[in-house]
From Swiss-Prot:
The keyword Iron-sulfur does not apply. It comes from Chlamydia pneumoniae. The lineage of its organism: Bacteria, Pseudomonadati, Chlamydiota, Chlamydiia, Chlamydiales. This is Co-chaperonin GroES. It is found in: Cytoplasm. Together with the chaperonin GroEL, plays an essential role in assisting protein folding. The GroEL-GroES system forms a nano-cage that allows encapsulation of the non-native substrate proteins and provides a physical environment optimized to promote and accelerate protein folding. GroES binds to the apical surface of the GroEL ring, thereby capping the opening of the GroEL channel. It comes from the Bacteria. The gene is groES.
Amino acid sequence: MSDQATTLRIKPLGDRILVKREEEEATARGGIILPDTAKKKQDRAEVLVLGTGKRTDDGTLLPFEVQVGDIILMDKYAGQEITIDDEEYVILQSSEIMAVLK
């Protein structure tokens, strides 16, 4: 678990995953500083905390396909956005992850 995740004291349930979106650059190519309202939601995020996993109908626990620290690709509008200590995070289901970036 990352240091940041340890201080959050949050544990997603089931097949949910806590991620933090990558920060959008605050400066445009021409050197213009972009206000928060002009920034786009990022579709890349770092996996911070994994839930307990998904269980099949027979009770088998399925392993996650991602690990803490992975950088993932997700839909910009996936999951539930939450704020903890003035930081933005997203809780999403493992099925909402499209890819792991290597």
